[in-house]
Amino acid sequence: MVVPPSVAPVGNVGNFELGGQAAGLPSGTMQYAGMTWVKKQYKWNPGDPPEAVAGLINEAHASGMKILLSIPGQLAPSSIDFEAYTTFLGGVAALGPDAIEVWNEMNIDREWPAGQIDPTSYVNNMLRPAYQKIKAANPNVMVITGAPAPTGYFGGCGGGGCDDAPYVAGMMAAGAGSASDCIGVHYNEGIMPPSATSGDPRGAGGHYTRYFQGMINAYTGAGAGALCFTELGYLSGEEWGTLPAGFLWRAPYNLTVAEQAQYLAEAVRVGVQSGRVRLIIVFNVDFKTFGDDPQAGYAMIRPNGSCPACETLRQVMGQ
């Protein structure tokens, strides 16, 4: 039995809110942990009717949760139909979700056509038209930019791929601030406490993407206003005794379950106290798959059904 560490409440959270990405909808567990949001991802295909996501919205609201819909799409096969996609988002907004994230990790060629990666194109062709159509349909929907993939791999920014901080700087220069309510952020490779900015044992240990505080600092430095962490995860393989090679950043299994619980709560504290973070969505609440992509290792609800992070998050949120 993992006994989670005791965590002091952060105090006044202001307009900060907490949620989780869930495979199901364990709303009672989530609400116990201080969460008011659930994130669901829907992969858009040209021709999809907006009603395809109505069930997700209705289920969340019936459970007393707000819902963030992350809506990436097909590359089909080498271009994106911006008009069809943004029209779809306008139709979704009319159904009453609480937030929409416009695409996903558009700085890498897994999520954007190779050779066409460009923050200015994203803002002009996708984000701004989407923002206008969403707000026309329902001005209460929060519009979050797609979160870039955190990376220093490209050493800059080009059509084949773009590091996330220069991508965000490019988005802001193109006017993303007036075409969104929040800048999306992903952070899921951490093995250091959330307040740390140095000491990571991996190569490139000084790179900002290794650190939660580093991400806040880098995106703020790139000109971003309010930040919404639409994926925040800490990976523990403790119950399995190991992790796949691509996810093993500190032997034998990155973090203990107790560390995961502590770091998630500390990330909330650091985020709230920064004054920069509007929303944190924990990745994830209840995923059960553990393979080449060890999603269950990120889960708050562990294989034995316990949820140490539920206790630490509840405490830090002052529940």
Language-model features: locations:
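Glycoside hydrolase catalytic-domain groove-lining segments
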Residues: 50, 54-58, 184-247, 268-277, ...
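Short, acidic/polar
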Residues: 20-32, 52-53, 80-92, 160-174, ...
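Aromatic-rich peripheral "rim/lid" segments of glycoside hydrolase catalytic domains that contact
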Residues: 9, 21, 30, 106, ...
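Boundary/entry segment of secreted carbohydrate-active catalytic domains
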Residues: 3-45
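Aromatic-lined carbohydrate-recognition surfaces of secreted/lumenal glycan-active proteins
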Residues: 127-168, 211-212, 216-237, 276-287
